[in-house]
């Protein structure tokens, strides 16, 4: 739940009034001095018919007051009824307090949207805290596939969201360039190198990467080395081919990400942990050993299903069980090289030492079992001062009209991210990847996401923004001086008499606009950008519904030619909708078109 004390939006204002009421009750002796008010929240009620806002104040403070929740609720409600902005107060169930605000509050809320302009929804809740978000981090062994796409979009949108909420965000990509898979990449590229020299390589052997995307690597190796590599033994050519292959794969990956407008500030090489000026992995193991968290020991045989990294031998172990894990974890393999886990601990220590006490990792669904050990390691290596939130991104099922999509010839065994973006566009990909919670499997239908219908959420939301601009264009007849530029148009509409907006559907739309800053804060604190996508769809739905009502009921049309005052008020409301849709879409990394083409 957001720390609403750092917020300036309407919900935070009402929370402040609830706090003031509790302070008054403390003065009267109904609450003890020093009562913790941080547990109080003000939020939309689950049932909109109960009012505009609800608070749990009586429920969480009743024990302190040594009173029944409902009795305390009566005392709080009595004082809240005296507040200028509150119309009615009711008590539900055991002691929940429901509030209905006066209509004038919603007119004022619209003015707040216009006054803030593009800044509406921005927050200081993050307090400029440094946050490192590591996402994508696909192995540098080929082009991005559609599965990578979801994690890429999620991580980028989360970074945008946290920046909007006032965090200092660094976007990072961890290059897995030290494992066996990059040696396989090098051998696969060397085969393409021989092919580029004119050799018939036949079928790609089992265990190597078969995709055509390595053909340009072979060509580049010939341009750089001629036939010289062919005469060298593998231990000599492999490091050179590996480095070239990784570099070209990363350029391909960066180009794929650019198609979705995704960039990273930091690309961190796993290999640099070991081959840099210092061996960071060895340093980290020594650091943990000095704390008593690394020891030489033999793990007991696993119970039930086999553990993938179990070996019946004495080995170097991290005392993960001391930090909540189920079993202690090996740091060295039988051949003396580091486990991936050891490198991962060192990598996160590097981030923590750089000032990132708040770290977010975006992982694929197949890494879910890795979370507990990694969080144990973070607690140990940061002495409890660092926090790691792992967001699991579930699988994407790619469909066309409900049928699974066939694999790509270019990649050999998967559909590439670029193929999907080229077919349906970046906006459709980004919005739909965020229109479901990250830990739920997503069906992505290539045919559905380009439909121009309510059933296509990205179209429906973007159309809301375009429809608003269409209304502005049509209003020129009544208001010839209505500016086209956003800031000038907002300035023109600021003196609109928003109190004329009295229809229940208009007030519902204003309530929805007032909810946006709180939605942003709650989504940021929960690391859940899908909440913004859901909000935008609901806002667009209410806006479209109001437009449709105006078609059937002339007095509700946005433009009333013989009533300039109500028209200007409704244009101000439309501007509020357009501004919030644009701000929300920007968080998701989706464009807000003025016209749909």
UniProtKB/Swiss-Prot annotation:
GO terms for cellular component: cytoplasm. InterPro entries: aa-tRNA-synth_I_CS, Arg-tRNA-ligase, Arg-tRNA-synth_N, Arg-tRNA-synth_N_sf, ArgRS_core, DALR_anticod-bd, Rossmann-like_a/b/a_fold, tRNAsynth_Ia_anticodon-bd. CDD domains: ArgRS_core. It is found in: Cytoplasm. GO terms for biological process: arginyl-tRNA aminoacylation. Keywords: Aminoacyl-tRNA synthetase, ATP-binding, Cytoplasm, Ligase, Nucleotide-binding, Protein biosynthesis. Belongs to the class-I aminoacyl-tRNA synthetase family. This is Arginine--tRNA ligase. It comes from Rhodopseudomonas palustris (strain HaA2).
């Amino acid at each position: 739940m957001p720390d609403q004390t750092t917020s300036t939006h309407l919900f935070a204002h009402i929370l402040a009034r609830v706090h003031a009421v509790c302070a008054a009750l403390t003065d009267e002796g109904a609450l003890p001095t020093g009562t913790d008010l941080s547990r109080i929240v003000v939020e939309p009620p689950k049932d909109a018919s109960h009012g505009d806002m609800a608070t749990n104040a009586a429920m969480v403070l009743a024990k302190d007051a040594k009173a029944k929740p409902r009795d305390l609720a009566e005392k709080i409600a009595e004082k809240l009824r005296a507040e200028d902005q509150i119309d009615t107060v009711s008590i539900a169930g055991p002691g929940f307090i429901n509030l209905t605000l006066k209509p004038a509050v919603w007119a004022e809320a619209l003015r707040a949207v216009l006054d803030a302009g593009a800044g509406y929804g921005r927050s200081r809740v993050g307090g400029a805290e440094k946050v490192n978000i590591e996402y994508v981090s696909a192995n540098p062994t080929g082009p991005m596939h559609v599965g990578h796409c979801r994690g890429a979009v999620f991580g980028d949108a989360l970074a945008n969201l946290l920046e909007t909420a006032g965090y200092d965000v660094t976007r990072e990509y961890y290059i897995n360039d030290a494992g066996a898979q990059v040696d396989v990449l090098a051998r696969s590229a060397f085969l393409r190198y021989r092919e580029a020299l004119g050799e018939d390589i036949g079928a790609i052997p089992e265990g190597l990467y078969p995709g055509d995307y390595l053909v340009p690597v072979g060509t580049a190796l010939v341009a750089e080395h001629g036939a010289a590599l062919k005469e060298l033994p593998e231990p000599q050519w492999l490091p050179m081919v590996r480095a070239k292959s990784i570099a070209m794969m990363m350029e391909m990956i960066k180009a794929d990400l650019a198609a979705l407008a995704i960039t990273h500030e930091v690309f961190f090489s796993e290999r640099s942990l070991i081959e840099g000026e210092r061996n960071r992995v060895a340093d980290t193991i020594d650091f943990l050993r000095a704390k008593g968290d690394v020891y030489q020991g033999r793990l007991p045989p696993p119970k039930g299903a086999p553990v993938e990294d179990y070996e019946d031998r004495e080995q170097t172990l991290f005392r993960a069980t001391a930090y909540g894990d189920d079993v202690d974890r090996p740091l060295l393999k039988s051949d003396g090289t580091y486990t991936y886990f050891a490198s991962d601990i060192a990598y996160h220590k590097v981030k923590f030492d750089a000032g990132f006490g708040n770290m977010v990792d975006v992982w694929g669904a197949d890494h879910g079992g890795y979370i507990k050990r990694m969080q144990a390691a973070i607690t140990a290596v940061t002495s409890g001062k660092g926090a790691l939130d792992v967001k699991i991104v579930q699988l994407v099922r790619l469909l066309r009209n409900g049928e699974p999509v066939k694999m790509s010839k270019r990649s050999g065994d998967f559909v590439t991210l670029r193929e999907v973006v080229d077919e349906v566009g970046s906006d459709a990909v980004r919005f739909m990847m965020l229109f479901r919670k990250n830990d739920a499997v997503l069906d992505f239908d290539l045919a559905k996401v380009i439909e121009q219908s309510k059933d296509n959420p990205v179209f429906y939301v973007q159309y809301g923004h375009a429809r608003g601009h269409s209304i502005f264009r049509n209003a020129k007849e009544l208001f010839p001086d209505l500016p086209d530029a956003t800031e000038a148009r907002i300035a023109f509409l600021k003196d609109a008499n928003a109190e004329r907006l009295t229809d229940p559907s208009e007030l519902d739309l204003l309530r929805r606009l007032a909810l946006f800053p709180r939605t942003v804060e709650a989504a940021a604190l929960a690391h859940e950008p899908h909440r913004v996508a859901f909000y935008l769809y609901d806002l667009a739905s209410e806006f479209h519904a109001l437009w449709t009502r105006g078609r059937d009921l002339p007095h509700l049309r946005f433009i009333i030619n013989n009533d300039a005052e109500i028209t200007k008020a409704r244009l101000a409301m439309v501007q509020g909708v357009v501004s919030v849709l644009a701000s929300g879409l920007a968080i998701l990394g989706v464009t807000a078109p003025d016209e749909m083409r």
